[in-house]
Amino acid sequence: MILLEINNRIIEETLLVKYRNAQAGLKPESIDIRIADFDGVLYHISNVNGDKTKVRISISLKFYKQLQEHGADELLKREYGSLLTDTEEGYNVSVLINLEEIPEDCEQIAKRIGLLKRNCFASVFEKYFDYQEQGEEGQKRAVINYRNDETLYVEAKPDRVTVVFSTIFRDEDDVIIGKVFMQELREGRRASHTAPQVLFSHREPPLELANTDARVGDNIGYVTFVLFPRHTNKETRDNTINLIHMFRDYLHYHIKCSKAYIHSRMRAKTSDFLKVLNRARPEPKNTEKKTITGRTFKRID
């Protein structure tokens, strides 16, 4: 299985090129790039007021207001500090790099900016991991509508944090492949005693979402992760967040890859079958004959 990168490689590499060109003394060039990411996230890389030495990176998330309720602004201040700048119109967060003042850790800065989406998501997980660590119970469940008609639920208890993703399967085939994929995850957990418990429910929401407005339907699936203190403590939580916030994209990416592989195998088998049929086709009878003098004639039966 393929693990998707948690950072946006286009942003990271674009900023690294800008830094390296500036370090080499090359004249800065203007930039105006818009980039789409998973979950409807949009980025915009541009110059501020036409100044080619000032590069602004902005991110837009449809669900950012819901993340703000769980400390997204505070987490971004902690992660980006002085890099934060006035937010570009139409976006939620903006950071600024100055090509006239290149820091020694410019590569790390480019990597951190490439993690903007991940760090926005991280706020809700860190908040509920802290609730669990402090033994707080009875806190309101977090509800993040991270995609159209798809929702993330996070709830903390003294001994665990439960994370539930709702997702929509666009095709009946997707449901079947999704079930097989989730079965593989459950089988994989048997080989690793430190892996979290993973549950999958189709059509009906899990018991954790009983008496809520969670959707019901033939194309609805719910994936539940049960995270224990070994997954949420200070030493391991960053890796847990890295993996879990991308899970929905990871699931659907592998569903699409599986379908593409099945289709390619079907096309290959069809091609092989056609070759067999073509070899079995009888050769047309040649009824044209020649006389001893070299003249030709066709025999008509």
Swiss-Prot record:
Per UniProt, the ranges with Basic and acidic residues bias are: 281-291
Where is the region Disordered? 281-301
What are the BP-aspect GO terms? actin filament polymerization; Arp2/3 complex-mediated actin nucleation; cell projection assembly; cortical actin cytoskeleton organization; regulation of cell shape
Q: What is the annotated localization of this protein?
A: Cytoplasm, Cytoskeleton
Q: Does the keyword Hydrolase apply?
A: no
* Gene Ontology molecular function: any one: actin filament binding
**Cellular component terms (Gene Ontology):** apical cortex; Arp2/3 protein complex
Cross-referenced Gene3D superfamilies: 3.30.1460.20
User: Which keywords label this protein?
Assistant: Actin-binding, Cytoplasm, Cytoskeleton
Question: Could you say which protein family the record assigns here?
Answer: Belongs to the ARPC2 family.
**Main function:** Functions as actin-binding component of the Arp2/3 complex which is involved in regulation of actin polymerization and together with an activating nucleation-promoting factor (NPF) mediates the formation of branched actin networks. Seems to contact the mother actin filament.
> Subunit details for this protein?
Component of the Arp2/3 complex.
Q: What is this protein called?
A: Actin-related protein 2/3 complex subunit 2
